[in-house]
Amino acid sequence: QRWYTAVVIDRLMFLWFLQEKNFLDNQPKYLQQRLQAHLDGKHTQSFYKRFLSPLFFKGFAQERTPETRAAIQAEFGQVPYLNGGLFAQHELEERYGEALDIADNAFQKLFAFFDEWEWHLDERALKSGKEINPDVLGYIFEKFVNQKQMGAYYTKEDITEYIGKNTIIPALLGKVRAEHPAAFDALAWPLLQHSGDAYIYPAMLKGVDVTYPPEIANGLDTEGPDLLARRKPWNKRADERSSLPTEIWRETIARHQRTREVRAKLAAGELKDVGDLITWNLNIRQFVQDLIEGCTDVTLLKSFWFNLAGRLPRHSHEKFRHGLSVLDPTCGSGAFLFAALNILKPLYDATLRTLQAVRADALMAGDTSHPEKWAEVDELLARFAAAGSDRAQDYAVTKHIIVHNLYGVDIEKQATEIAKLRLFLKLVALLEPGDTIAPLPDIDFNIRHGNTLVGYATADETEKAVKGATQGNLFSDAWEDIRIRLVAVEQQYNNFQIQQVQHGGHVSAADKQALSATLSELEKMLNYHLAREYGVNTTKAKDFDVWKSSHQPFHWYVDFYPLMAAGGFDAVVGNPPYVEYSKVRDLYQVKGIETLDSGNLYCYCIERLSVLCRDFSYSGLIVPIAIGSVSDTNKLREACSDLYGSLWNSHFAIRPTKLFDGVEQRLTILIGYHGSSDGAWHTSKYHQWFSDERPDLFSRLMLVSMPPRLSKQSPWPKIGSLVEARILEKLRRFEASPAQLLLTDASKWVMYFHRTPGYWIRMLDFLPFFESPAGDRSVHHIRELCATSEAARSEVAGLGSSSLYFWWFFAIGNCRNLTKGDLLGFPAPRLDADGSAEIVRLFHALMKSYKDNSSVKTRAKASYQEFDWVAAKPAVDAMDEFFANVFELTDEELDFVINYDIKIRVGDVAEEI
């Protein structure tokens, strides 16, 4: 019932947008008027059966012929023939037929609710709070319907755009270069080398050529004396000419230094690999557009086009070639697919424009040689020119992208309906009243419902399942039958896509039914084999149906056969569910997952990339930061070592601001290349940022090469500068952790710490005051450790209280909960007698400073001791100066440690310390 309700509401929302643009009988309130006329007529049949259902399946889905045109207009008025999957009979309608009905009062309430809103098809900024556009539909679904049930969160456009462009465009460039390496290199890398600042984002360029004030410039020399004192002014807010919102001079200078480094590498011609565009965070969208528009080599242009759009067969012996395939395996309401469409559309347009210009130049020059070279160009230009107006051509190009480039799967049926609806609305938004609406695409075979993690994904898995691991050739005939049917699937699937984008072409209900029937038979057969692997007695129909309903298997190898048979998808993007496996295990189980111990569905989705991504493809996912830091994901990190040839990670905190509103998730964005490479992995720092920084958050990302990992399971560092890399290497010189020798199970040398650090870590030799009706200790937050001696306690607690350890906790740790294991993992040398005496003195001074700078606060019914960390920071700095000598840090490295994230940690008083 929920599913069919979503189907009907999706159709009605689509029609509501149409009537707002006068596409329904030129009436902006077409549906309301038809409902009122029905109610006034006091008909015995419901509005749904008498008018709405016929409108769906006859008015919008029946092709106009001389015999039907007049009758359709007489019954429904002037309404467009839309075709497409939205108004084809849904599987629920085929299953239940006449039994489906909806009461009139449901439509009265729904239409009244719709009438309260302003409906817009464009992407204007929303002002009134009562406006609805296609983006809002996705937000509403993810925010209020899907989030709590499925661990899915609405992904904002800046995230989808960053991930999308850095996976889709590198995949395209890689495919074109593979076909024409010499021609590509001769065009691409000189363009980049001589581009100046064209591909450096404006945020990175802000103030880069402005002269620094003398007191700021005084801190640039890292070799001179008193570096920390000379750099003290760097904690002041930078001036507006030089800075981005909220920047202090320390951040502004780091950004400027990075920009100058990029400029130098560009000018020297050092950046000449597709991955460099990601590593140095260049404007990859503008680069590829300029690359295409500056190309005069028709062979290279055709390569761009056919790798983008696919190649329709021109002769009977030719095979259909698919375009760049972009998959979101957990697509939700389609946020990433929408972003992919917006990324691909300008590339289609640029390639068409450039082909048209190059062809015109050839004709003007009288070039009649090699007619076959131009034949396909002439045909594709004619196909899109036949659309007529610019808007109609935009419609044709957008439709082509939706049909030939975008694919999605989701376990939530309603999500896939919303995703398809948003793509349909994107098409209609291109038109104006009076335009003819070309038939909508049918993308029921592009956007699919099912469980990404349950089902056969490869030929080997499918063959093994059908033949049986121990049954010899008993099922060989069955496997051969499947292979024969898959050949038919490929032909039907390809024809289904081809027919939709050829001018005047359309897909009949019979075409769709034939493909659906073939797929259904294959799915039924594979479900039978898979259920047996799960121990289900398939002879008991009820048990079999319950298993199918709970597991919702999706057989990638069959359902996307033409793509999977060719090796997989070119670009995989998405935001997989962050759900602990234990919470869904009673509903469904996953099998064949090597990372099962990781215990979270997002981990299994990452492992699934190994079969979904073709060789030399790219993927981009946003996942919890735990992937790179906790022991539970050791096996996943090991798998990633084999999965990715190159990897680009960026990391984001939840304080002061978070990427997902209302969701407490520290996040990592993974951009990965699935092919052989030099194995270079790159990482950013752990970003703690303010909301004012969001507009430039992704355009000013700075990545550095990740230091060599100690093992495949080692934590992934979260660092963003060479200074941090040097500090990390100095720490790693010491294999042993002193805490392993200095801690014991019980003693009088107790230290206390808060398990969830905010902007600093306090390790104390006294229990902070806490009083509430529940007790005299904050049992949920305060943890304790015991040391072997006073000196041992001072060393462990002093190190734990330092800014050096605070940085290390975020660079290597889980960024959330501080544990004994985190302390045991910190490498350091043992102190000699003089060092032990000094650390005891420094620790006593720090404890005195904490006590002197504390007060008792009351919140609700609890009273607690609050510490002024800013006032105590000089004592913390003294601790860091001590450990800087221990680890042989340079003044530049010590300056970084003492001032690590200083703006976030101390706020507006940063300039005073």
What residues fall within each predicted segment?
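Glycine- and acidic
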Residues: Q1, H120-K127, E142-K156, A186, ...
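Signature of N6-adenine DNA methyltransferases within the class I
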Residues: Q1-F87, E91, T155, F338, ...
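Preference for the N-terminal adenyl/adenosyl cofactor-binding alpha/beta module
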Residues: Q1-P346, A357, N405-A415, G450-L453, ...
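Short, hydrophobic/amphipathic alpha-helical patches that form generic packing surfaces
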Residues: D10-Q19, S53-K58, E142-K143, L421-V428, ...
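Extended charged low-complexity segments that act as oligomerization/scaffolding linkers
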Residues: H194-G196, A362-A392, A396-L406, D444-G450
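Non-catalytic DNA-recognition/assembly elements of restriction-modification systems
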Residues: C331, H529, F698-S705, R709-F753, ...
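Long, amphipathic alpha-helical stalk/connector segments used for oligomerization, subunit docking
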Residues: I482-S508
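Basic, amphipathic alpha-helical recognition segments used for DNA target recognition
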Residues: R783-G825, D832-S849
